[in-house]
Design a protein with these regions (language model features):
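Accessory interaction regions appended to the cores of large information-processing enzymes
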Residues: 1-194
Length: 194
């Protein structure tokens, strides 16, 4: 599992042009660590710039792997249509399932979408899903990400006839088998285990 330790912001523009209708979506968002009952500040400051937050809608999403994602729509003035918000959320969720730091599940994050841009013809759900996913990934990496459980590099020497049992046990503990070899009459398993 992974999470973040401080607030960060990111902007991402997804733009693809090919012959006919293209793809365009731009998302500006803020990520921050989340805990139960945490208030939403009225303003955030990053690099001397101030960002005013006007909460339009909040979704609290309990995650299957534990923790929560709190998604806040703070778009003012229609810079992104409300119909694209579910696509942005879907992009963020897909990145939380494969956290930006190690590929482990991310948890306990609040995301505030505060601005963006759309195109009357080229904007669609896919564009905003990708823009949301990539903006989240960029912001997450700048928000002091940390691993919530240690992952150990493990070498196990085991008799050949017990190899299957040991592999099953390691995988049952969410271990990832990285390699196998034979050494002095034993099988050697190399794995990463939480």
């Amino acid at each position: 599992r992974e999470t973040i330790t401080k607030a960060a912001r990111a902007d991402y523009r997804h733009k693809k042009q090919s012959g006919g209708a293209g793809q365009f979506g731009e998302v500006h968002l803020i990520v921050e660590p989340y805990y139960e009952g945490m208030p939403v500040p009225e303003t955030y400051k990053f690099n001397g710039q101030e960002f005013k937050i006007n909460v339009k809608g909040t979704e609290e999403i309990p995650l299957e792997w534990g923790g929560k994602l709190v998604f806040i729509n703070s778009i003012v003035g229609g810079s992104i249509d409300a119909r694209f918000m579910p696509a942005i959320l879907k992009g963020i969720m897909s990145r939380m399932e494969q956290g930006p730091l190690t590929g482990s599940y991310a948890r306990d994050v609040r995301v505030i979408v505060y601005d963006g841009k759309m195109h009357p013809v080229d904007s669609n759900e896919i564009s905003f899903m990708l823009a949301g996913r990539n903006a989240f990934s960029e912001a997450f990496k700048n928000a002091g990400p940390k691993i919530l459980e240690p992952i150990y590099d493990v070498e196990v020497f085991v008799p050949s006839d017990k190899m299957g049992d040991v592999m099953s046990d390691l995988q049952g503990r969410r271990g990832m088998i990285m390699g196998m070899s034979s050494e002095s009459g034993y099988e050697k398993l190399v794995a990463k285990v939480p």
